[in-house]
Amino acid sequence: MREFEADGRSIQAEPGETILEALRREGIHVPTLCHMEGLPPTGACRLCVVEVEGVPGLVPACSYPAAEGMKVRTRTPRVLQARRTIVELLLSSHPDDCLYCARSGRCDLQKLATDLGIRQRPYRGVQPRQELDVSSPSIIRDPSKCILCGRCVRMCEEIQGVSAIDFIGRGSRTYVGAAFGSGLNLSSCVNCGQCLLVCPTGALSEHSSLDAVVAALGDPTKTVVVQHAPAVSVSLAEEAGLKPGTDVDGQMVAALRRLGFNYVFDTSFTADLTIMEEGSELVERVTKGGVLPMLTSCSPGWIKFVEQFYPDFIPNLSTCKSPQQMMGAIIKSFWAERQGLDPARIVSVSIMPCTAKKFECTRPEMAPAHVPDVDYVLTTRELGQMLRMFGVDLAAMEPQAADTPFGERSSAGKIFGASGGVMEAALRSAHFLITGREIEHVRIQALRGFKGIKEFHVEIDGLEVGAAAASGLANARTLLDQVRAGRRDLQFIEIMTCPGGCINGGGQPIGADLKAVRARME
């Protein structure tokens, strides 16, 4: 350990830690805009500058190593003025439409300006008029609000391995965009929305379907049916100001009915169908010489990733639809017939933790006879906004059960939202199908957790099955490249597009730290 002084306090730093890491661990706040936890620092925004005794200039705390005996000052007039000037310069060319911005009240730049007491605009910069990119069904890009922090670029390239966006141009003409100035719909974007989660301003936001859903709820000729994913019930609490990880499943069902939805179904029901189908398919492929390793097919961002970057692995994908699309198909076929309803008059809405689900429901193969199985997808954030719009207090709702017959679920369906959950549930099903016995639960939990790639080998009635679970598409690349190179000990691979799984999806509450995401998993 190395000891140094910060604002008169003694701070212990681990070897290799930066000043910022040591200060944050001790609860000392230093503002940043470009910093991303877990990635090497760039020092681009300079908001984290501090004074170090003996060093003539201000130093970036995010990249300056903590050293024994150094004396650091984080809030001197010189430091505070430097931070104010940086934010004032960022605001000099930033749009003034905060009241109409999707991130109003949750904008890092807005909060910094408030915290630093900036009430006037001392600098006037050029505000270039750049068109909104609304080409993607999942994400809206507003280049005029981009502050070039680089967080979206790093997320897309380093964590997701997609590189759909990058810095374009030089100097004051630099901007972030897709190749050749095209829209996101023509780029390699997989619609995961992870860029949206790390964007500090309103430069990136989801393509909202909220107005369309509200209009449908007000149409007496429509039967509006809603399904909700298991990951939503453990994250919606944050939108209502409750403790992260609080499971509000029953209250959410009651709130959805209060909003006016005619029927409320639990997507965990079709997650159970997915588990049984994938388990059966795995057994058949392993025992009858099918294409291996079998790859899960629940995550739409991952499916687009395979189609674009690894088309040779398309035969390896499970034949299952995602639980969302399974439920949508059942609602507009079996359930509609049972209820005596015209599928064309059913509005099928899903509440998902994922922006890529908005893309998935628009795929032509998900609209037999040109009638989409799922009409609209709302993210967890959009549902939170809808509750506030309608004045529904989630915490005050009495818990209710989802409607039958699609309100029943097993515990296996509930764990779908966490990385490793699909794999664990499918392996348990495969084990039961082969042996007639439940698998030892403690051992299979090796597939859970936040590790990017997890592996597990199990013997099922003399049959050796190697399984791996990866979350984050850069980790998916690693596994697929190993299989391409000749690795043969894996028969089943689960891929979740988002790091940690759906609990950390692109449609989840903004501003959640790792502690909050872990609480959702638990």
Where are these regions (language model features)?
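Short, well-ordered turn and helix-capping elements at secondary-structure junctions
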Residues: G8-S10, F180, W335
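Short, contiguous strand/loop micro-motifs
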Residues: A6-D7, I139-I140, S182, E238-G241
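Fe-S ferredoxin-like electron-transfer domains
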Residues: R46-N191, L197, L204-T223
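Iron-sulfur-associated redox domains of electron-transfer enzymes in respiratory
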Residues: A13-K71, R75, V79-Q81, L91, ...
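Eukaryote-biased recognition of intrinsically disordered, low-complexity regulatory segments
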Residues: M1-R9
